[in-house]
């Protein structure tokens, strides 16, 4: 894996998934050079989708993409059985890869993680992207566990690393050849400078062209040019997490007239003071017309 993979929002309209809006967003992203799209992850509000909605979104995204870029379907769960079933479904409908978050809330030990991911890996043939985000799961995949999984299962090929500890990223890259993708927009360049391959991005939903340019410069070793774009987008990157993701990105998309719609409870609308900060940042970047 290499490049920019937006973690796409799930647009809603009148309480249901807005599939036409989803199609428009996907076309916009592909036209602006992304390497793939990642539906039903954190940004896609997977915790508040019903199982049928979750599967339908994956199916529709595969259909809308129609082979133009990769589809990396979010299929993780804190239930190994559910993760396995979602992953098998994603493979059956044509997803290119699956994204598996570490089990949250039940906080398994490292041995439990090995068995959890191993069960899913043995049940499918498509490549698996591990997803480490300790700030949400209260659980870190240790580098030795990542190495074990990469060595043991041929279809575990990449990790979305959202642990902001660059020491951990360095250790992962030092001990195994797994593809490391940043799970934090603002750490994309630092991680790529260590040998990372790109990013699963939030900000790319609204600024895909610029973010793709930044990553392509980094891939070519042109870090001076990449840094210019990084610092240009940095204030907006930080605002994407001024409240819980995906509240800021969906708010920004609504401001820009992009299909996004409401959030599902328990997520709710952004505080007015933060909306003003977001609006100012979008104006500064010339994104608001």
Swiss-Prot record:
Give me the disulphide-bonded residues: none
Q: Name one GO cellular component term.
A: cytoplasm
Instruction: Identify which residues the record assigns to the active site.
Output: 131 (proton donor/acceptor), 160 (schiff-base intermediate with substrate)
What broad class describes the main subcellular location of this protein?
cytoplasm
Query: Which SMART domains is this protein grouped with?
Result: DHDPS
Q: Name one GO biological process term.
A: diaminopimelate biosynthetic process
| Location in the cell | Cytoplasm
State the UniProt keywords alphabetically: Amino-acid biosynthesis, Cytoplasm, Diaminopimelate biosynthesis, Lyase, Lysine biosynthesis, Schiff base
InterPro entries assigned to the protein according to its UniProt record, in alphabetical order: Aldolase_TIM (IPR013785), DapA (IPR005263), DapA-like (IPR002220), Schiff_base-form_aldolases_AS (IPR020625), Schiff_base-form_aldolases_CS (IPR020624)
Write down the chemical reaction(s) this protein catalyses. Answer: L-aspartate 4-semialdehyde + pyruvate = (2S,4S)-4-hydroxy-2,3,4,5-tetrahydrodipicolinate + H2O + H(+)
What pathway, per the record? Answer: Amino-acid biosynthesis; L-lysine biosynthesis via DAP pathway; (S)-tetrahydrodipicolinate from L-aspartate: step 3/4
Q: Which GO terms fall under molecular function for this chain's record?
A: 2-dehydro-3-deoxy-phosphogluconate aldolase activity; 4-hydroxy-tetrahydrodipicolinate synthase activity
Site entry (Part of a proton relay during catalysis), positions: 42, 105
NCBIfam families membership = dapA (TIGR00674)
- Quote the subunit structure annotation: Homotetramer; dimer of dimers.
**Functional summary from the UniProt entry:** Catalyzes the condensation of (S)-aspartate-beta-semialdehyde [(S)-ASA] and pyruvate to 4-hydroxy-tetrahydrodipicolinate (HTPA).
| Protein family according to the UniProt entry | Belongs to the DapA family.
Protein name as catalogued: 4-hydroxy-tetrahydrodipicolinate synthase
Organism classification: Archaea, Methanobacteriati, Methanobacteriota, Methanomada group, Methanococci
Name the encoding gene, please.
dapA
């Amino acid at each position: 894996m290499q490049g920019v993979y937006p973690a796409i929002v799930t647009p809603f309209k009148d309480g249901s998934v807005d599939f036409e809006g989803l199609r428009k967003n996907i076309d916009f992203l592909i036209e602006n050079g992304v390497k793939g799209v990642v539906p039903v992850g954190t940004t896609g509000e997977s915790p508040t989708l019903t199982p049928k909605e979750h599967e339908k979104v994956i199916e529709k995204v595969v259909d809308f993409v129609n082979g133009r870029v990769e589809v990396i379907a979010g299929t993780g769960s804190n239930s190994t059985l559910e993760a396995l079933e979602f992953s098998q479904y994603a493979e059956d409908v044509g997803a290119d890869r699956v994204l598996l978050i570490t089990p949250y809330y039940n906080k398994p030990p490292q041995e439990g993680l090995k068995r959890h991911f191993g069960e899913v890996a043995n049940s499918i043939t498509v490549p698996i992207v591990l997803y480490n985000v300790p700030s949400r799961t209260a659980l870190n995949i240790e580098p030795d566990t990542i190495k074990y999984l990469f060595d043991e299962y041929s279809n575990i090929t990449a990790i979305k690393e959202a642990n902001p500890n660059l020491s951990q990223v360095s250790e992962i890259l030092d001990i195994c050849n797994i593809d490391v993708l940043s799970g934090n927009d603002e750490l994309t360049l630092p991680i790529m400078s260590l040998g990372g391959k790109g990013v699963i991005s939030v900000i790319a939903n609204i600024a895909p062209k610029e973010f793709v340019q930044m990553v392509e410069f980094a891939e070519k070793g042109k870090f001076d040019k990449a840094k210019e774009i990084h610092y240009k987008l940095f204030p907006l990157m930080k605002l994407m997490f001024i409240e819980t993701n995906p509240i800021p990105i969906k708010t920004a998309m609504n401001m820009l007239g992009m299909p996004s719609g409401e959030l599902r409870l328990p997520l709710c609308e952004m505080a007015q003071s933060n909306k003003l900060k977001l609006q100012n940042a979008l104006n500064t970047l010339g994104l608001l017309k």
